[in-house]
Curated annotation (Swiss-Prot):
The encoding gene: rpsJ
InterPro entries xref list: Ribosomal_uS10, Ribosomal_uS10_CS, Ribosomal_uS10_dom, Ribosomal_uS10_dom_sf
Protein name, UniProt field: Small ribosomal subunit protein uS10
A Gene Ontology cellular-component term: ribosome
Function (record text): Involved in the binding of tRNA to the ribosomes.
UniProt-listed SUPFAM superfamilies: Ribosomal protein S10 (SSF54999)
Length: 102
């Protein structure tokens, strides 16, 4: 008999909100008796952009900006219907992207 697994990937620009959301998901799953693996921190994606400061000349004077995308992975092993209902009812903060695979 194959065991069922729910894989949850979280993405956010702010790591504090991301960790708070991961903690809420883990607590909700453990309250219903499911086994939880994680949250596992995945590599942070860093996008860097260089912009010329001057509107006309001076290519040498540039400003650098970066966007960091933090990611976490949570596996819920053998979820019951109660566990799935509890996860669906969670109210997570805005700014957190959630991807769920069964």
């Amino acid at each position: 008999m194959a065991k069922q697994k729910v894989r949850i990937r979280l993405k956010a620009y702010d790591h504090k909100i991301l960790d708070q959301s991961a903690r809420q998901i883990v607590e909700a799953a453990e309250r219903t008796g499911a086994l939880v693996a994680g949250p596992v921190p995945l590599p942070t994606k860093i996008e860097k952009h260089s912009v010329i400061r001057s509107p006309f000349i001076d290519k040498d004077s540039q400003e650098q900006f970066e966007i960091r995308t933090h990611k976490r992975l949570i596996d819920v092993l053998d979820p019951s219907q109660q566990t799935i209902n509890a996860l669906m009812k969670l109210n997570l903060p805005a700014g957190v992207d959630i991807e769920i695979k069964l």
